[in-house]
């Protein structure tokens, strides 16, 4: 297996995405409506919106965990399905197997001589020295670092993040944001982050997309230099622009986004 550090630049470059006339319905309920979106290779995009607006459904469609009712998902000019080996998804829960050591969780499903690659991935997230420990010995933030290493070992060109930091305390969350931003800058993959935290979105993303009732309500470019100064008036102004748009809509208790697990996901249902 080739080292992450030895990868040719063209393999580390992110996947360009195109979403065309995307619709997703569950029965009579239309969750996504005519989504059109172009994401250049290597862009860091944050997707925000009220609970139940359709943002996690969009990520599941991009991950191949569900199929659109109508529309196209493209990686460049090819179907996104052709890029599944280059795509990895992280959830809010790390989903580590407690009966496997940390290094074995990182190399889960791989064959051949993968241990050196697993150690390198753990080194990238700052946990190489914990490789032979059990997941139970880790904090919540450390478990998410292992989940991130498990994605990195596959050398993704598209990284999909479904609120992976939502359960972390404030300081650990900022540390994870900085780590994800560092790895994105280092490896050049395309990132889509679903988050409820607007301040998080404007702090680390190139672009913030607001989903409103299944449609794109706002597409905001975050044209600020990195590293960004948290608490700056420029970040605060961008955050206020997004929040003002969200709060301008009448609030109503949303229905949860429908979820139909694939057979391979049923083991996580409990």
Swiss-Prot record:
Source species, domain of life: Bacteria
Its EC number(s): 7.6.2.14
Membrane topology: Peripheral membrane protein
EC class (word): translocase
Main location: membrane
Domain ABC transporter, residue spans: 17-238
Keyword ATP-binding recorded: yes
Gene Ontology cellular component annotations, sorted alphabetically: plasma membrane
Subcellular locations according to the entry: Cell inner membrane
Catalysed conversion reaction: ATP + H2O + aliphatic sulfonate-[sulfonate-binding protein]Side 1 = ADP + phosphate + aliphatic sulfonateSide 2 + [sulfonate-binding protein]Side 1
Keyword Oxidoreductase attached: no
InterPro entries according to UniProt: AAA+_ATPase, ABC_transporter-like_ATP-bd, ABC_transporter-like_CS, ABC_transporter_ATP-bind, P-loop_NTPase
Residues involved in ATP binding: 49-56
Family: Belongs to the ABC transporter superfamily. Aliphatic sulfonates importer (TC 3.A.1.17.2) family.
Function: Part of the ABC transporter complex SsuABC involved in aliphatic sulfonates import. Responsible for energy coupling to the transport system.
Subunit description: The complex is composed of two ATP-binding proteins (SsuB), two transmembrane proteins (SsuC) and a solute-binding protein (SsuA).
Entry protein name: Aliphatic sulfonates import ATP-binding protein SsuB 3
Originating species: Pseudomonas savastanoi pv. phaseolicola (strain 1448A / Race 6) (Pseudomonas syringae pv. phaseolicola (strain 1448A / Race 6))
Organism phylogeny: Bacteria, Pseudomonadati, Pseudomonadota, Gammaproteobacteria, Pseudomonadales
